[in-house]
Design a protein with these regions (language model features):
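Short amphipathic alpha-helical surface micro-motifs
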Residues: 7, 84-86
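A well-ordered secondary-structure block
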Residues: 99-109
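N-terminal, active-site-proximal structural segment of metallo-dependent hydrolase catalytic domains
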Residues: 15-81, 88, 92-101
């Protein structure tokens, strides 16, 4: 968690030094890619991110390699579909894998 916050604030500091640039920051509770219709759809989540075009996305409620997600690394899946770099921070062990938060960013963490 500290590592993610340090990465986020470091990116904010570096990018804020360039006054002409704009930093697009997004936060997104993805509910493990389950929509309000109860359907798990990684592409739908990726489309929301891609349409927003953020520099950094802070993502909550991510599964990593759980039975519930069919052993999918959800953040990695989203990273591939958005062409952003992932950084995952597990909060708890859950359902045979991990559950936590993550960051997707244009720059390599």
């Amino acid at each position: 968690m500290r590592k993610l916050l340090l990465l986020l604030f470091s990116a904010l500091f570096v990018l804020s030094a360039q006054a002409e640039d704009v930093l697009r920051l997004m936060t997104y509770n993805v509910r493990n890619a389950n929509g309000m219709d109860g359907i798990c759809n990684y592409q739908r989540v990726a489309n929301v991110i891609n349409n927003t075009r953020p520099d950094i996305v802070a993502i909550q409620e991510l599964d990593s390699m759980t039975a519930r997600s069919n052993r999918t690394d959800v953040l990695k899946e989203l990273a591939e579909r958005t062409q952003l770099h992932p950084c995952f921070a597990p909060a708890i062990d859950y359902d045979g894998g991990k559950y936590g938060i993550g960051i997707l960013s244009k720059e390599t963490p």
